[in-house]
Amino acid sequence: MDNTLIDPRIIGKHVYGNLYEIPEEIAGDEEYLRNVVVEAAKLANMTLLEVKSWKLGGEKGGVSVIALVLESHIAIHTWINYRYATVDVYTCGEKSDPWRAFNYIVEKLKPKEYTVNYADRTQLLKQ
């Protein structure tokens, strides 16, 4: 069997993580979080198509913001009482930088600590 180098046809980059001990006033501020996502998309050279957000009440209440970008998506989900957030940035193509978006979001949400994961989701086709 020939193991010739494979050709990446789709460049998929996925950066995601968990943010701990974020300020409650940030975790619950839907407008602020929307603005953070919009700016993160710009900084990462993404083409913003639409932003949706909503605030959920109750003990596990929080805010969700999802940006659809031409290259894929950015999502933030917060839990106010737990001072916790998850962040997901996925891009397709070579021109966008999901790391830049993720790092900007972390800077603006001000966690005391966070974890970050990366998955290369490039489709590799044998030649």
Curated annotation (Swiss-Prot):
Cofactor note: Binds 1 pyruvoyl group covalently per subunit.
Cofactor(s) the protein needs: pyruvate
A Gene Ontology cellular-component term: cytosol
Keyword line: Autocatalytic cleavage, Decarboxylase, Lyase, Polyamine biosynthesis, Pyruvate, Schiff base, Zymogen
Residues annotated as the enzyme's active site: S72, H77, C92
Site annotation Cleavage (non-hydrolytic): residues: E71, S72
Family classification: Belongs to the prokaryotic AdoMetDC family. Type 1 subfamily.
UniProt protein name: Arginine decarboxylase proenzyme
Lineage: Archaea, Thermoproteota, Thermoprotei, Desulfurococcales, Desulfurococcaceae
